[in-house]
Structure formats: structure tokens, C-alpha cells
Curated annotation (Swiss-Prot):
This is Chloroquine resistance transporter. Keywords: Amino-acid transport, Disulfide bond, Glycoprotein, Membrane, Transmembrane, Transmembrane helix, Transport, Vacuole. Residues 1-163, 280-300, 798-871 are annotated as: Disordered. It comes from Toxoplasma gondii. Belongs to the CRT-like transporter family. It is a multi-pass membrane protein. Disruption phenotype: Enlarged vacuole compartment. Disrupted endolysosomal system. Reduced growth rates. Slower invasion kinetics. Reduced virulence in mice. Impaired secretion of microneme proteins. Reduced transcription and translation of several endolysosomal proteases. Decreased bradyzoite viability in vitro. Reduction in cyst burden in mouse brains after infection. No significant effects on parasite replication at 28 and 40 hours post-infection. No significant effects on parasite egress from the host cell. It comes from the Eukaryota. The chain crosses the membrane at residues 350-372, 392-412, 423-443, 448-468, 472-492, 506-526, 545-565, 615-634, 641-663, 674-694. Nutrient transporter. Involved in maintaining the osmotic homeostasis of the digestive vacuole. Required for the proper organization of the endolysosomal system and, in turn, indirectly for microneme secretion and parasite invasion. Required for bradyzoite viability and cyst development. Can function as a drug transporter. Can transport chloroquine. It is found in: Vacuole membrane.
Length: 890
């Protein structure tokens, strides 16, 4: 039996793989009854759906009824009685008890009487009544009411006339004007099952009915999510044929043969009838295009549009799945990367810490320079006030830190006995430098400040030569000359061809800013001398220096009255008023608002004190962080990193001063001379740094030559130097065979073998490089209250100089110290058996078997005649510029 076309499923897509199954099922379900008529094969339904409104659909049905049965609308009384008689006979044949699913008489609405309930339904709305191939109406009077070739047979086998249609007319009328829901569907199914029991085998179609029901049950069990279940106690007019047709859109050939055939227009008409029959009901009609979400189409859309919409939704779901998979993969990748980064940081914690400190030092040093210029531009008329404010803030800060770090565990006696006059000298130098820097920065642009700050290296070189009698490598001098050349490249064009407006730079103020680096350099060298042989706490040092800088600052304020300052000059009588007006400006009150702001720097600028406290606070914050990260970098990575930061800060700060986003209206237009000058300055800094490296190599060659080492000094490893030079250091310094000539940065930052330590010091002004002080070898306290260290370039004291001599009358050598700290002799009968001096670090004997007999050395007899106080051999902090007679070191 060829399969009939589904009314709502449309044409099947190729490749479903059930064509053979459909043919097999069609052959198995052939009816054994010779009177059974095989349904005719209709043409394939059109793909275009007949879109009609509910009103037009009703008119179309009325027209069809009028054409099919023109005289059936006025039946006579005889036909009506005959129909009622046939209905009574059919009811009598059925079972006495209705099935369990049948509704009781109380559940039916009042409009349906028992007579109406027992009357066969003839509505043309039902697809089962409209199709002559319905398996439910196999051999009963529930076939199509329209005239057809297959006539209905009664119980006696005589063909009957088609059923009259008074109920049809009533149904149409109710459809048009009655808003109540129609309930003929369940009643029709009730009578269909009562009048067509399974024992009715008039045409043998009960086989189709039974197999169709079993197939439907199997399909419903497999596709439970497609079924619309009715809650118990609720009686709805679910269209059974419509449910089956939608729940089995891709059923087998046997299933499609059982379902009624029809075009796509039948489905739309059926959906319209279903909506009309459920007018006023809460539950939507299953199978209608507007509510059938499984079809994925709105009312009236053709099948092609519905399929396109389904494809679009599938593509959207696929895209969402791909996006979700990408997000999950990215998340897992980020987790793995974070885990690997954490492991790498754990393995290289020291390197990461030093890198972070160096980067933060670069940021804070750049911010310190920029905020200094912005603060000066905000309060240009109150240099005395800014000088004191930027100093007094740090006094309580560093005293609090010193109290926490130094006084908590008890202040060391060495720090308590350190002369406070040395702090006063340092404070005077720093205060003098700060006043000159703030006055000069008023009419010095940002890029010019960056260039002039590098002159501090040249001044430090000169101060070390004069005060420390220190010798430098030739590369140091060459680097200093290149730095001077870079400064001239930047400033020489302005000196030769000065502009009318000055471009923000005034020569006198530039010169003052340049000379402010000289006291800074002298202060650093003085601190190196003052703390030689003394271990000083950094916070304790900075607290006292800041205090003296603030107090002495009042004595240095008369520098603001210099006549060369022009409009920026503050007479001595007006200094107190200037301090008070500066304090008012700090909180936003303007004072100088008249006779100001003239062109050509002929008048002082007008006050613009709004928000001045913000810029002062920013500068103080960056300055404090800058000094803090200097300490971290020096302790973690060494002073060499501070040189790297100072070099990198040049181009970064110059670009920041040229940026209008950072400096606003005070941005400096970039010039070619500034760019070339920065390149020359960077080259000079690199050469100067290379001089320190070359000097260290020269010292290592000298040590290897004095040691008698045959191999190249450049091939010595730190382990070899430690093994060979344990006793050699004693010999070298005792015999005075090596001169210090200064200590390089590499030796200063080595925690294991260095003889000096670098301690950063506080600076309230902008310096070219982080200021620091060299603190030499550790202290050695004695009973007389003095403090002694082995000077880096001097002989050791006689009381702590071991030497070797032959005992009289014996052939053995004994190690002896003529006088120890208590004045008693200390001898040992064994060769090289002198005890290890824990304070000086000297071994008991020379260990080399060599004897030094040159006069003036530590082994000379005139050096061991008695105990000499250590203070005679230690460099006094207050003595500057005096050299030792024996080797020229201070």
C-alpha cells in the first residue's frame, strides 16, 4: 500500500534511511478482507500554505458545505428519525459500561443532553471525520459525511444515505457567534469507540486500528517530551489526529499510511478551527503554528520559511556552543599561565623583588621630578615657604621610624656617641642646596632641570678628589667631560641666541639651579668621611639631618633677597610676611593679584593658589617613596642599579615634560638640541660607569701581582679569592703594600667580600642620582669606649698585628702579640698557633713563611713596644682633608 502524504509534515527530506522500512511495513499491513479498498494515491501536497484568516476560513468551509450537500441543510423528519434509530442500535451493540477514560454525565456541560451525547458527531471540523482513511472510523458511521465512492454500511449491510447535517449547521453557527468552547471532539471519540469495538470485523480494518494504536503508544513512549499531557480532572478538546500528526513528523511508512493525507493548507485550517474551538480556554491548542514551538514558525509562514528559521536557530546554538568552548579553553589557559607564573616567581623571588624595586624607583624618581616642577609653578612667589614646608614634614616621619627601628631594641652606644655637630654640618649643606634649587626652578623649564641635574656627578668627582684625595680611572674623567659637553649642547644655543620671551628659561635662575648641585655633592662626600668606621642607622641619620636642615633653613632664607633675582627678590624685611602669605596660598588664598604677570619676566607672576596643597602633597608623597625605594634597591640589588635608574630617568622625564597631557600649559615644546643633548649625557654616564669597572679590574690585577699569583687575575673566581686571600689581606694591609685609591661600586655592594657598605640618605630636593653615603667595615668596640676599624688604606694597629719571630735558643717560630687589650703579653709556643682575632678578623699567623723587615711596617720592632689606643689609628669623623703620613690616605 503506497503511503499517503502527511497533512502537516510536508515533504520528507532525502537521506532519512527508512524508505525500505516504509515499503516493508506497507506490505505487512495489507488487509486480508477482499472488501477493503486501498486508499487512492494523491498528488504531493503543495509547498505553499494557504494563508487565511479565521473568518475567510469559515467562509471557505461554508462554501464547501453548500456545494457538497445543498439540500442537506433542510432534512425531513423521516431522515432524522432514521438517523436516531441507527444511533440507538449502535449504542445497544456497544458494551454496557463505558471505558474508564469516558467522562461521566456530570462532567459534560448542560448544553449536551444524553441524547446529544449518544448521537454520532458529524462535524466536519474533525480530521478523522473529514478523511475516509482514518483507522478510528474503520467500519462505522464515522466516515466522511460528504458523498464519496465508499458508502456507509449499517448493521444489516444496506448502504445508507449520507448523514444529514443539522449538527453541522448548528456547529457553524456556534462557531460564528457562540464564544463557548466546543466539546464535540471527546464526545466523537467516545461514540467512535463505543460503536466500533475490536470485535467489529465487518471489513477487517480493526487490524489497522490495533496496530496503529500500538505504534502510536510506542512512539509516545519514545518521545515523551513531544506529548501534551492533560492534567487529571481537566477536560480539554485535544485533537487526537493533530497530536499524532505532529508527534510523528518523521514516522515510518506504516505510520504515515495510517495518518490522514492532505495539503499544507489543511494544517492551517485545522489550527484555525482549533483556536476557534478553544476560544476562552486557558490551555492553548496543541499543534497550532502559533503555539507549536517544535515547528519553530509563526502563523502563516510557509514551510520553507519555517525550515530556514530552524536552520538559523541551529546555527545560533552551534555558534553559542563554539563560543562557550573557546571561553572555557581561555579560562583553563589563563589558570595554567597563572600557575606557571606563580611557580616561576617562587623560584626567582629575589630577582622579581629587585626588578619590582628598580621599576618603582624609576617611577617614583620620575614622578618626584615632575611634581617638583608642578609645585614650583603653582607657588612661584613663595620659595621661602616651600623650602621650609618640604623639610619640616619629614622630621616627625623619620623620628617615628627611628623610634620604631632603633630605640625599640635599645639605641646602640655608637650611634648615641656620634657627634651631633656632624649632623648640623650635613643639615646646613642640604638646606643651602634646597634653597638654591627652589629659587632657580622658578624660571627653569623641566627639560633644562633634567639636564642640569647631571652636573652633580661632575661636582662629586671634584669633591672626592679635593676632600678624599681619591684617584680615579681615566674613564671617569672622560665621562665627566662628556657630561659637561651634553649640558653645553642643550644650553649653548640659548646662551648665544636668547629669545625675547626666554622660553621659560632665565640664565640667572638656570645658573642658581646648576650651582645647587655643588652643596649636594659636598654633603655626600662629607657623609662618607663622617661615617667612616661608624655603623649608623639610616632612619636615625635622616631624622637628625632633616631637623637641622629645617632649623638652619631659617638662617639660609636671606638668599631670597639677592638683587640678581629681579622680580622674585624678597627683601629681608618681608621674609616673615612671605612665609605667612605662602602658608595662606598653600590653603588656596591668593595674595599677589595686582602689579603682576607682566611680559618678559619683568614682574612676578600672579597668585593661582587654588588646589596648591594637592601639588605640594603629591611632591612630598613621591619624595618619601623615592627615598624609601632607594633603600630597598641598594639593599637588594646594589648601588649599580641606582646608576641604571638615573640613566633611564633622563629620556623618560624629558618626554614627560614635553607631554601636554602631563604638564598641561607648562609643557615644553621639544627641540632638536634637547634630544641631542640627552644622547650625549647618556653616553657620558655610560663612560663614567665603565671607568668604575676598569678601576676594579686594575685593583684585582694589583692584588694578584702582590699575591704572586701566576694565573690571569681576570680568571679568578670568588671561591679562589676567598681561599687564597684569607691571610693575604692581613699581610697586605699590615705591610702597607697596597693603596686603596677608592672603592668601586661593585665592591661596595658585595655583601660577602666588600669593605664598604652603601647607605642611602634623605634628600628633600631633586638630585641627579640617589644620594648615599659609604659606611666602611664594621665597628670594633674596645674597653676605652672608642671605636676602631681597619682603614681601607692604612696599616693595622700594633696591638692587633700578629707577626712571626724566632724564639731565643730554639729553632721554632712562635706567634706573638706584644700587648693585648689588657696590656698582657700573649704568646704561643707552636708555630702559626695564634688565635683568631674575632674583632679584627685577622688570623693567628701570616701563614706564608715570609718575614717583612722594612721599617715602618707592622712587623717592625718599634711598632710593638706597647698598647696604642685604637683612636690614634682610626679616621676621626670631624677631620676632613688631612692625609695619613705613611701612605697619603685620610
Amino acid at each position: 500500500m503506497p503511503p499517503a502524504h502527511h497533512g502537516s509534515g510536508g515533504r520528507r527530506r532525502p537521506g532519512r534511511g527508512n524508505k525500505g522500512k516504509r515499503d516493508t511495513e506497507a506490505g505487512m499491513t495489507a488487509s486480508p478482507d477482499p472488501g477493503y479498498m486501498r486508499p487512492e494515491t494523491h498528488a504531493a501536497p503543495s509547498q505553499q500554505t494557504d494563508v487565511r484568516s479565521p473568518a475567510s476560513a469559515r467562509e471557505h468551509r461554508n462554501a464547501d458545505v453548500g456545494v457538497a450537500a445543498p439540500d442537506a441543510l433542510t432534512p425531513n423528519a423521516g431522515e432524522q428519525k432514521e438517523v436516531e434509530g441507527v444511533a440507538k442500535v449502535n449504542v445497544a451493540v456497544s458494551s454496557d459500561q463505558p471505558p474508564d477514560w469516558a467522562p461521566s454525565q456530570s462532567d459534560l456541560p448542560p448544553s449536551l443532553s444524553p441524547t446529544t451525547a449518544s448521537r454520532p458527531a458529524t462535524s466536519s471540523r474533525s480530521p478523522r471525520a473529514r478523511s475516509r482513511h482514518s483507522p478510528v472510523a474503520s467500519s462505522s458511521a464515522f466516515s466522511s459525511p460528504a458523498p464519496s465512492a465508499s458508502a456507509l454500511t449499517s448493521a444489516s449491510g444496506v448502504p445508507e444515505a449520507p448523514l444529514a447535517a443539522p449538527e453541522l449547521k448548528h456547529t457553524l453557527a456556534a462557531d460564528e457567534g457562540n464564544p463557548e468552547p466546543r466539546l464535540e471532539g471527546p464526545v466523537e471519540r467516545l461514540h467512535a469507540r463505543q460503536e466500533n469495538p475490536l470485535t467489529d470485523s465487518s471489513d477487517g480494518s480493526y487490524i489497522l486500528l490495533e496496530e496503529g494504536e500500538s505504534q502510536r503508544a510506542c512512539l509516545d513512549r519514545k518521545n515523551r517530551h513531544l506529548r501534551q499531557t492533560t492534567p487529571p480532572g481537566v477536560w480539554t478538546t485535544a485533537d487526537l489526529a493533530s497530536q499524532n500528526s505532529h508527534s510523528a513528523s518523521f514516522a515510518s511508512g506504516f505510520r504515515r499510511a495510517l495518518l490522514p493525507s492532505g495539503g499544507s493548507g489543511d494544517h492551517d485550517e485545522q489550527a484555525s478551527d482549533c483556536r476557534a474551538s478553544l476560544r476562552g480556554m486557558q490551555r492553548p491548542c496543541f499543534g497550532s503554528p502559533s503555539t507549536d514551538t517544535r515547528m519553530g514558525a509563526a502563523e502563516g509562514l510557509p514551510l520553507a520559511s519555517r525550515r530556514r528559521r530552524q536552520h538559523w536557530r541551529r546555527e545560533l546554538r552551534a555558534f553559542g556552543a563554539v563560543a562557550l568552548a573557546c571561553l572555557r579553553a581561555s579560562w583553563h589557559g589563563m589558570k595554567r599561565a597563572r600557575l606557571r607564573a606563580t611557580r616561576w616567581i617562587d623560584r626567582n623571588a629575589a630577582t622579581v623583588r629587585v626588578a619590582c624595586y628598580t621599576f618603582l624607583l624609576l617611577v617614583t624618581s620620575t614622578g618626584n621630578t615632575i611634581c617638583f616642577k608642578k609645585m614650583i609653578d603653582k607657588m612661584p612667589n613663595y620659595s621661602p615657604c616651600l623650602t621650609q614646608v618640604t623639610t619640616v614634614v619629614f622630621v616627625p616621619v623619620f623620628f617615628a621610624l627611628s623610634l620604631y627601628t632603633d630605640y625599640a631594641g635599645g639605641l646602640p652606644q655608637e650611634m648615641a656617641d656620634f657627634p651631633k655637630r656632624n649632623f648640623a654640618v650635613m643639615g646646613f649643606l642640604d638646606s643651602f642646596s634646597g634653597v638654591m634649587a627652589i629659587i632657580g626652578a622658578v624660571h627653569t623649564t623641566g627639560t633644562t632641570q633634567v639636564v642640569l641635574q647631571q652636573s652633580c656627578i661632575v661636582f662629586s668627582l671634584l669633591a672626592s678628589i679635593v676632600m678624599l684625595r681619591k684617584r680615579f680611572h681615566a674613564a671617569h674623567y672622560l665621562g665627566a667631560l662628556v657630561i659637561i659637553l651634553g649640558v653645553l649642547v642643550v644650553k649653548l644655543p640659548d646662551l648665544l641666541h636668547p629669545s625675547s620671551d626666554g622660553g621659560g628659561d632665565v640664565f640667572v635662575f638656570n645658573l642658581l639651579y646648576l650651582l645647587s648641585n655643588l652643596p649636594t655633592a659636598v654633603s655626600c662626600v662629607y657623609k662618607e668621611v663622617a661615617f667612616r668606621g661608624v655603623e649608623m642607622g639610616t632612619n636615625y641619620l635622616q631624622a637628625w639631618v632633616a631637623l637641622f636642615q629645617f632649623l638652619i633653613g631659617f638662617l639660609v632664607l636671606p638668599l631670597n633677597a639677592l638683587p640678581v633675582l629681579g622680580p622674585q627678590r624678597v627683601p629681608l624685611a618681608e621674609l616673615p610676611a612671605s612665609l605667612w602669605n605662602g602658608t595662606r596660598c598653600l590653603f588656596g588664598f591668593n595674595t599677589i593679584v595686582t602689579n603682576c604677570g607682566g611680559a618678559g619676566n619683568m614682574e612676578s607672576p600672579c597668585d593661582n593658589c587654588e588646589g596648591a596643597w594637592k601639588y605640594v602633597g603629591m611632591y612630598l608623597s613621591f619624595n618619601l617613596l623615592y627615598n624609601m625605594f632607594i633603600i630597598f634597591v641598594v639593599k637588594s640589588g646594589g648601588a649599580a642599579l641606582t646608576f641604571l635608574v638615573s640613566t633611564l630617568r633622563l629620556p623618560v622625564t624629558a618626554l614627560a615634560f614635553c607631554s601636554r597631557a602631563i604638564m598641561g600649559d607648562r609643557a615644553v615644546p621639544p627641540k632638536a638640541t634637547d634630544f641631542y643633548g640627552l644622547l650625549v649625557l647618556i653616553l657620558g654616564l655610560v663612560i663614567y660607569r665603565a671607568g668604575g669597572i676598569m678601576k676594579r679590574r686594575a685593583q684585582r690585577r694589583a692584588v694578584a701581582a702582590a699575591r704572586g699569583h701566576t694565573s690571569s687575575p681576570m680568571m679568578l673566581t670568588p671561591r679562589e679569592e676567598e681561599q687564597i686571600g684569607t691571610i693575604f689581606v692581613e699581610e697586605v694591609f699590615a705591610a702597607g703594600e697596597l693603596e686603596d685609591g677608592g672603592v668601586t661600586e661593585e665592591d661596595e655592594t658585595d655583601d660577602d667580600t666588600s669593605e664598604v657598605e652603601v647607605h642611602p640618605v634623605f634628600s628633600s630636593v631633586v638630585a641627579s642620582e640617589p644620594p648615599h653615603v659609604y659606611v666602611h667595615t664594621k665597628r670594633h668596640s674596645h674597653s676605652d669606649g672608642g671605636y676602631h676599624k681597619l682603614p681601607a688604606c692604612g696599616s693595622s694597629p700594633a696591638a692587633f698585628t700578629p707577626f712571626t719571630q724566632r724564639m731565643p735558643g730554639t729553632g721554632s717560630e712562635s706567634c706573638s702579640r706584644r700587648r693585648n687589650r689588657d696590656g698582657d703579653d700573649e704568646r704561643s709556643p707552636r708555630s702559626h698557633a695564634c688565635s683568631f682575632d674575632e674583632e679584627t678578623g685577622f688570623a693567628g699567623g701570616t701563614g706564608t713563611g715570609r718575614h717583612f723587615s722594612s721599617p715602618g711596617t707592622a712587623l717592625s720592632p718599634n711598632r710593638v713596644g706597647g698598647y696604642e689606643p685604637p683612636s690614634m689609628h682610626a679616621v676621626q669623623p670631624a677631620v676632613i682633608g688631612k692625609s695619613r703620613a705613611n701612605n697619603g690616605c685620610i
